[in-house]
Amino acid sequence: MISPFVLRRTKNEVLKDLPDKIENTVLVDFSEDEKKLYLAHLAEANQLLKTLDGSKDRIQILAMLTKLRQICCEPRIVFDDVKHMSSKMEACLNIIQTYKDNNKKIIVFSSFKSLLNLLAKELDKSKTSYYMLTGDTDKADRKGLVDAYQNDDTTVFLISLKAGGTGLNLTAAEGVIHFDPWWNMSAQNQATDRAYRIGQKNKVFVYKLIMADSIEEKIQTLQAAKKDLADRFVEGNSGSITTMSGEEIMSLFSED
């Protein structure tokens, strides 16, 4: 009698069968008005920090971090009186236009549904075809959207990181944009793997959009210096920064 056995392939073995994955960090400069807005709210956050207990007031600190992130991404999702497109939005649209011009597909991931809604409006203006999947998308519609994107000529798939960062097969895409990279590197990698997986026949280009001289760039620096921080931070979890030291938290709000 022959004993049964299970053949498993490690991820590294699978990667050998895939085309290259090219990862790019795209540093975007603030406009003059954006820089003034960002620095004003950074100063406000630092004033508030002086009144908080870093070990107890983590929810308020997380709220300040989130607001600064949103200002980096697109001030229009925070302030009704801001009318101009953000520098990061412009950079994202430029990348998308390149893919559209070359008849290639690209996915955009964001943690913020409001940002995806705004991006969708910009795509409408340029008559760029897209699908969108967020937490509001019915489960019954998810498969239909994926199948359509895999087989039709739609250029862009806008996806909420929390709603669609796992469980989707989108190998028709050759590009992935992370609009607002954050602590959770494993979540970002899983999202990238919606395109970079078995069945992918082309190189996949990954773009992380980062505002220069901002909280986003500080986060990237901390990630590089201390990769285990990425595993401590989970999006949407109010207790996600409880394991960070006060010094680590304060470094995010420094103005240098």
Enumerate the language-model features and the residues they cover.
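Cytochrome P450 catalytic domain signature, combining two hallmark sequence patches
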Residues: E44-K50
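Conserved Helicase C-terminal RecA-like lobe
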Residues: E13-L39, L52-L168, G239-D256
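Generic structural signal of hydrophobic/aromatic residues within well-ordered alpha-helices
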Residues: A45, L229-A230, E248-I249, F253
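SF2 helicase/translocase ATPase core recognition
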Residues: V14-A43, D141, V156-S240, M244
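Conserved P-loop NTPase motor "coupling/switch" region that bridges the ATPase
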Residues: M1-N12, Q200
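A residue-level signal for conserved active-site and pocket-lining positions in enzyme catalytic cores
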Residues: I2, L68, Q223
